[in-house]
Design a protein with these regions (language model features):
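Residues in flexible loops and secondary-structure boundaries
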Residues: 33, 50, 55, 108-111, ...
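Short loop segments at secondary-structure junctions
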Residues: 13-16, 50-51, 113-115
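Residue-level detector of solvent-exposed, low-hydrophobicity positions
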Residues: 67-68, 75, 107, 113, ...
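Acyl-donor binding region in acyl/amide transferases
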Residues: 31-105
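Short, charged low-complexity intrinsically disordered segments located at boundaries
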Residues: 2-8, 72-75, 97-104, 122-123, ...
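Hydrophobic transmembrane alpha-helix bundles
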Residues: 19-33, 74-76, 112-127
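Acyltransferase donor/substrate-recognition loop-hinge adjacent to the catalytic core
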Residues: 96-156
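A conserved beta-strand-loop-helix scaffold within acyl/acetyltransferase catalytic domains
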Residues: 1-45, 88, 129-169
Length: 169
């Protein structure tokens, strides 16, 4: 991970040592309103069914989620200024107990259209690269000025995401 950070909250059965709940995120360097900051994509949320009601309402999912939020979200050094994710079955519980908000109704953002005919310039060449270098950093530096909010897609991030991915080798 380009941030060098791990963001995981666990619930463990102390009698057996078994992990019974997990709330994790992918920390990201984010460009927001002209400033580099940290954010987190929420991923891999799970609680074993027999443990979901543990501790009464709001249940173990919300308890582990609160621990994650209290630990990683804030304005302190190294904290994420926001988190985001895709809807999960526990979305309503997250909305009620963890402050999840529906930012966008994604099914309104797409429509199938035929691909337009595009002209091809003889001045451009498209090639495959093994690794990203300073040229992609220059591209990102030029592009970020047009963006209000985006994951920083510089060479460090793109190499981690694609070139260094285990499935590439």
């Amino acid at each position: 991970n380009p941030t060098g950070r791990t963001q995981i909250a666990l619930a463990e059965d102390t009698a057996t040592g078994q992990v019974v709940g997990h709330y994790a995120s992918l920390p990201l360097v984010t460009w927001m309103e002209g400033v580099r900051t940290l954010s987190a994509q929420i991923v891999d949320l799970m609680v074993l069914p027999q443990w979901r009601a543990y501790g009464g309402r709001p249940g173990l999912f919300a308890q582990v989620g609160r621990l994650w939020t209290d630990t990683f979200i804030g304005e302190g050094e190294g904290q994420d200024v926001f988190s985001f994710g895709w809807p999960v079955p526990a979305w309503r519980a997250g909305q009620k107990y963890l402050g999840y908000l529906n930012i966008r109704d994604w099914d309104l953002l797409f429509r199938e259209l035929p691909a337009p005919q595009r002209t091809v310039s003889d001045e451009l060449v498209v090639t495959q690269v093994e690794r990203y270098g300073p040229e992609v950093d220059r591209l990102w530096d030029a592009m970020q000025k047009e963006l209000r909010l985006a994951v920083v897609r510089d060479a460090r991030y793109l190499n981690w995401r694609f070139a260094d991915h285990p499935d590439v080798r």
